[in-house]
């Protein structure tokens, strides 16, 4: 080999070595798709990853590399006989490969078909006329953006986790941020008219869960499903409107900002503090009613529990199940009457947190055999006064005279003849009344059915 050839090879080797960082920095992510693109949910699909917590993903789009990044695709957890099309956060390496299956479990922050999960061989298609359609294995439509004929040019997953259909001018035609499910990511809004709805459980994703979070012109509210819904969290924001836009909340780095009477670029009406994010972060309304914030810290860690405030865990509607009494985190059924009669038993034996069941169910036709079981020194997580300026006897009689009433909750300050009465139509968990916190006296009277 000539000296010139050796020098040429040496130069090429030196050049490649010096520029190896440039080679490794080339983008390997796949954040967008053109029209007439389709993906099929099969075991052989590319970018499939099984995690040790039982979850599995088949990514269709992924944005970014090295660290926690957003991806979307098919997701399942558990038996994996049904799948969501979802946006989730995963851990990636410098080549945009999905890594850390033992700790970097996918965190779902949006889903399209939570009420209509699909099976193996389901397809996702970005059609030639601009519709994004999810079809189950049998060809039935599980979900669609309904954007056919709206000049869609392509699909993009943004760095903030927003799944966007855009037109030739790059303007948004449809975006997942306008259709929140049970979570918000930084920069995302929840606008009046929208709501977050908790899933039933970690593996039952349907929005038939008990809890919802919404914002309106009065503030931020969390409800448990009932008829009517019962609020277990209220953040009332006073003030006069300085904005013509609808009220909204926005998840920011360091706070949940409440734009109730204002809008950006102005200051929020109020904020709920959240620890500053050092990595990926998101907020989720979960199946137990908690609104938790999670952050990646070499594993997903809870960094805030936003609704657990002054009254603690016992203020959650189903912390002890229906009719059960929560006292310092312990659950128990209401005791016997003064005559020794028992009216409640544990719904699930040896599981007091699963609630209590009436031994004899209430019947409107048997109202003459109904009475009220007094449970002293307890209160309820919500109080929507049904009767004001009243006394305990009028409160009790109002419940006995109303078939739909399941309990009478009476409370007063210093004058028992001038109290308030709440008549819930459904009874969830009851809690001890800590007078040092509530500054009122409170008693519950549970409507029960005599057996004879």
Model-derived regions: residue spans:
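Beta-rich ligand-binding surfaces for carbohydrates and other polyanions
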Residues: 2-452
């Amino acid at each position: 080999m000539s000296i010139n050839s050796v020098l040429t090879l040496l130069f090429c080797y030196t050049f490649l070595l010096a520029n190896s960082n440039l080679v490794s920095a080339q983008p390997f992510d796949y954040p967008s798709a053109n029209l007439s693109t389709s993906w099929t949910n099969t075991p052989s699909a590319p970018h499939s990853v099984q995690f040790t917590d039982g979850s599995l993903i088949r990514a269709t789009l992924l944005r970014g590399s090295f660290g926690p990044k957003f991806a979307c695709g098919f997701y399942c957890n558990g038996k994996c006989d049904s799948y969501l099309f979802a946006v989730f956060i995963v851990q990636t390496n410098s080549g945009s490969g999905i890594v850390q299956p033992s700790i970097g479990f996918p965190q779902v922050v949006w889903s399209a078909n939570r009420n209509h999960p699909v099976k193996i061989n389901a397809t996702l298609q970005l059609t030639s006329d601009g519709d994004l359609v999810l079809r189950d294995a049998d060809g039935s439509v599980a979900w669609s953006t309904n954007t056919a004929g709206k000049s869609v040019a392509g699909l993009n997953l943004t760095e903030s986790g927003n799944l966007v259909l855009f037109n030739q001018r790059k303007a948004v035609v449809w975006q997942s941020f306008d259709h929140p499910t049970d979570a918000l990511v930084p920069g995302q809004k929840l606008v009046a008219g929208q709501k977050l709805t908790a899933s039933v459980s970690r593996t039952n994703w349907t929005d038939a869960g008990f809890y919802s979070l919404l914002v309106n012109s009065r503030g931020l509210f969390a409800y448990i499903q009932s008829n009517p819904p019962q609020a277990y969290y209220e953040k009332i924001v006073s003030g006069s409107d300085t904005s013509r836009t609808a009220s909204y909340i926005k998840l920011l780095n360091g706070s949940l900002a409440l734009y109730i009477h204002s809008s950006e670029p102005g200051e929020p009406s109020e904020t709920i503090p959240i620890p500053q994010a050092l990595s990926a972060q998101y907020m989720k309304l979960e199946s137990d009613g908690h609104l938790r914030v999670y952050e990646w810290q070499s594993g997903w860690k809870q960094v805030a529990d936003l609704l657990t405030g002054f009254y603690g865990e016992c203020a959650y509607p189903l912390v002890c199940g229906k009719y059960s009494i929560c006292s310092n985190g312990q659950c128990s059924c209401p005791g016997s009457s003064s005559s020794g009669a028992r009216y409640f038993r544990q719904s699930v034996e040896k599981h007091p947190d699963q609630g209590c069941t009436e031994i004899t169910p209430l019947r409107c036709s048997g109202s003459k055999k109904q009475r009220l079981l007094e449970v002293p020194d307890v209160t309820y997580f919500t109080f929507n006064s049904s009767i004001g300026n009243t006394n305990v006897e009028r409160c009790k009689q109002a419940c006995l005279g109303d078939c739909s009433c399941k309990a009478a909750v009476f409370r007063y300050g210093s004058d028992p003849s001038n109290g308030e009465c709440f008549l819930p139509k459904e009874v969830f968990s009851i809690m001890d009344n800590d007078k040092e916190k509530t500054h009122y006296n409170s008693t519950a009277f549970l409507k029960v059915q005599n057996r004879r």
